[in-house]
């Protein structure tokens, strides 16, 4: 990676090697990082990444916004109604055998 690169992980803890990231940030191999999930959650207070000033961290709640909560509720309710009306999109169902 270029020294101007930023690593961002909003997916799952463990995707990014936290020890390697710490060293890359501390040694200036990359410019910065933004991390939402950690391998251990909640991340311990003594997590070495917390000592650095070129990283932004959040407690794995970056997706918890008013809009996301509204949309989760809306789509859950819509799928229930669609199911009862026989209009549920089968692509949204993991265990399709329950539809028959």
What function would you assign to each model-found segment?
Residues 3-100:
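Rossmann-like dinucleotide-binding domain for NAD(H)/NADP(H)
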């Amino acid at each position: 990676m270029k020294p101007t690169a930023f690593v961002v992980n909003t997916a799952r803890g463990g995707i990014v090697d936290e020890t390697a990231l710490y060293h890359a940030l501390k040694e200036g191999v990359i410019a910065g990082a933004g991390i939402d999930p950690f391998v251990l959650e909640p991340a311990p207070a003594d997590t070495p990444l917390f000592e650095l000033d070129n990283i932004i961290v959040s407690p794995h709640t970056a997706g918890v916004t008013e809009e996301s909560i509204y949309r989760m509720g809306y789509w859950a309710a819509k799928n229930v109604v669609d199911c009862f009306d026989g209009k549920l999109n089968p692509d949204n169902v993991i265990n399709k055998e329950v539809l028959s």
